Amino acid sequence: MTARSSLTIVLAAGEGTRMRSSLPKVLHPIAGESMLAHVLAAAPQGDGAAIAVVIGPGHDAVEKEAKRLCPDVAIFVQRERLGTAHAVLAAREAIARGADDLLVAFGDTPLITAETFARLRAALAQGAALAVLGFRAVDPTGYGRLLLDGSKLVAIREHADASEAERAITLCNAGVMAMDGRRALAILDKIGNTNSKGEYYLVDAVAIARSQGLDAVVIETSEDEVRGINTKAQLAQAEAAMQARLRQAAMDAGVTLIAPETVYLAADTTFGRDVTIEPFVVIGPGVSIGDGAVVHSFSHVVQSKLGSNTLLGPFARLRPGTSLGDGAKIGNFVEAKAAVLEPGVKVNHLSYIGDAHVGAHSNIGAGTITCNYDGFNKHKTRIGEGAFIGTNTSLVAPINIGARAYIGSGSVITRDVPDDALALERSPQTTKEGAAARFRNAKLRQTK
């Protein structure tokens, strides 16, 4: 059987004024990715799958994000806000290509899943001309009601127009819709604007399809999956729902989350086997964690790689570009940025390792700082394998510390150190016998 082609149109033209933000609504992040990114990730992918995004005038940032995520995306601009059907028809050029399945989604519903899109498409494959996504609302007030005759959808009744009996219905319209792509324009072009707002409503497609002798059906999903986001409070609710989903997926994959509700994950976080995450850990985008790794409490990780059997934290921070080799350890109050730590490296306490490459099995003592910035440019620190850096050491980059070299505690190292060398840089210690007693006695006499 030949695979069905698809066109997914994502409506992202809204201003999002209730967000009270200069950032376009669909670009607000959920689990480290924009809302738009989540919707596009759920849309059908691969051969025969096309994506179009409808944006508002001047929404260059939304266009840029869409193209970052899907280089082949088609961008269409809805010049006037005249309703959802009008927005869909902004992509007329793409619709006219006649994909088998036309999907209409919204850029502010980031919890939509690929499985739900697949179920909508399956309904079309089984002969429906229209499949509308519905949900059972806890409080249906304000939602359009889905009116059924047996298994067929006969109408979508807006709340304001619904009778008392219809308002008692809890099956509500989510807005997401699938349509027979070959019949889509014939249906959409029939939608009029004879209503109080003079707008073209996509929900009218149901009545038009039925008037053409075509079947419409409802596909049900959970209310959480289709919850739209219009305010920062709703954004927080969506974040909570997404985090619950990500935590459950991680635990299902074998990750131990000791206090799941306190751990924050990104949508693209990947885990190996037997990973343990302690409470109050934040994992941002671009993080992979290898087999047997342990992330202790109050650690923060972004765009970093943790190898197998690594230990991180507590109170550790990994910034972008950091890679921990197998068995490496980053301890408490250590920050690493753009640093490669080879297998077995230990940085146990109170250190900053930035723009650095640390060779295997090196030991970095407490209070070590790689001084990587001269006020204008960042510079590299290279530490060879098996090196020992004493406590309270400053390594002024650019600098190379040789393999198996020793750096004495309290040193400020400004020149390269060869392999197997010992480098010390500190003032000679001065000890004056009895001076403390003399100082103390003098102070006591002054207080009498």
Swiss-Prot record:
Reaction catalysis annotation: alpha-D-glucosamine 1-phosphate + acetyl-CoA = N-acetyl-alpha-D-glucosamine 1-phosphate + CoA + H(+); N-acetyl-alpha-D-glucosamine 1-phosphate + UTP + H(+) = UDP-N-acetyl-alpha-D-glucosamine + diphosphate
Q: Region entry Linker: which residue ranges?
A: 233-253
Task: Give the residues the record marks as binding UDP-N-acetyl-alpha-D-glucosamine.
Answer: 11-14, 25, 78, 83-84, 144, 158, 173, 230, 319, 337, 352, 363
Q: Which GO terms describe its biological process?
A: cell morphogenesis; cell wall organization; lipid A biosynthetic process; peptidoglycan biosynthetic process; regulation of cell shape; UDP-N-acetylglucosamine biosynthetic process
Write down the required cofactor(s). Mg(2+)
Q: How is the cofactor bound?
A: Binds 1 Mg(2+) ion per subunit.
- UniProt region (Pyrophosphorylase), positions on chain: 1-232
Q: What class of enzyme is it?
A: transferase
EC number of the protein: 2.7.7.23, 2.3.1.157
Extract the ranges annotated as region (N-acetyltransferase). Answer: 254-448
Q: Which residues bind acetyl-CoA?
A: A366, N372, Y373, S409, R426
Its subcellular locations are: Cytoplasm
Q: Which key words tag this protein in UniProt?
A: Acyltransferase, Cell shape, Cell wall biogenesis/degradation, Cytoplasm, Magnesium, Metal-binding, Multifunctional enzyme, Nucleotidyltransferase, Peptidoglycan synthesis, Repeat, Transferase
Which cellular components does GO assign to this protein?
cytoplasm; membrane
SUPFAM superfamilies in the cross-refs:
Nucleotide-diphospho-sugar transferases (SSF53448), Trimeric LpxA-like enzymes (SSF51161)
Q: Which residues form the active site?
A: H349 (proton acceptor)
Q: Which residues cross the membrane?
A: none
Q: Which PROSITE patterns match?
A: HEXAPEP_TRANSFERASES
Pfam short name (any one) = Hexapep
Where is it predominantly found? cytoplasm
For molecular function, the Gene Ontology terms on record are:
glucosamine-1-phosphate N-acetyltransferase activity; magnesium ion binding; UDP-N-acetylglucosamine diphosphorylase activity
Q: In which pathway does it act?
A: Nucleotide-sugar biosynthesis; UDP-N-acetyl-alpha-D-glucosamine biosynthesis; N-acetyl-alpha-D-glucosamine 1-phosphate from alpha-D-glucosamine 6-phosphate (route II): step 2/2; Nucleotide-sugar biosynthesis; UDP-N-acetyl-alpha-D-glucosamine biosynthesis; UDP-N-acetyl-alpha-D-glucosamine from N-acetyl-alpha-D-glucosamine 1-phosphate: step 1/1; Bacterial outer membrane biogenesis; LPS lipid A biosynthesis
Q: Which family is this sequence assigned to?
A: In the N-terminal section; belongs to the N-acetylglucosamine-1-phosphate uridyltransferase family. In the C-terminal section; belongs to the transferase hexapeptide repeat family.
What is annotated about its quaternary structure and interactions?
Answer: Homotrimer.
Which purpose does this protein serve, as stated in its record?
Answer: Catalyzes the last two sequential reactions in the de novo biosynthetic pathway for UDP-N-acetylglucosamine (UDP-GlcNAc). The C-terminal domain catalyzes the transfer of acetyl group from acetyl coenzyme A to glucosamine-1-phosphate (GlcN-1-P) to produce N-acetylglucosamine-1-phosphate (GlcNAc-1-P), which is converted into UDP-GlcNAc by the transfer of uridine 5-monophosphate (from uridine 5-triphosphate), a reaction catalyzed by the N-terminal domain.
| Record protein name field | Bifunctional protein GlmU
Protein source organism: Bradyrhizobium sp. (strain ORS 278)
Q: Gene encoding it? A: glmU
